[in-house]
């Protein structure tokens, strides 16, 4: 199965707004795909955040849902995909 790592920067003034939007994103993604994300912040840098989604079985459906649901965040996002070695 595939794990997705989506990272981006957030203006410090928008962190709480983005936090609420990310929770709504996680709820929608979980409803549609059964995959629950985790929101993380870079340890040594307060403006870099990451969404982690593990054990994605249906990549096509997940990517479609992620693209659709994340558009509302209005952030430039970078997505990386990893599989178990």
Report the location of each language-model feature.
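Short S/T/G/P-rich N-terminal loop/turn motif that feeds into the first structured element of a domain
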Residues: 1-67, 76-85
């Amino acid at each position: 199965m595939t794990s997705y790592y989506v990272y981006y920067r957030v203006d410090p003034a928008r962190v709480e707004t983005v936090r609420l939007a990310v929770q709504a994103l996680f709820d929608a993604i979980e409803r549609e795909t059964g995959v629950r994300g985790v929101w993380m912040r870079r340890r040594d840098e307060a403006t870099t955040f990451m969404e982690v989604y593990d054990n994605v079985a249906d990549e096509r459906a997940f990517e479609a849902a992620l693209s659709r649901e994340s558009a509302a965040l209005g952030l430039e996002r970078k997505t990386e995909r990893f599989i178990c070695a």
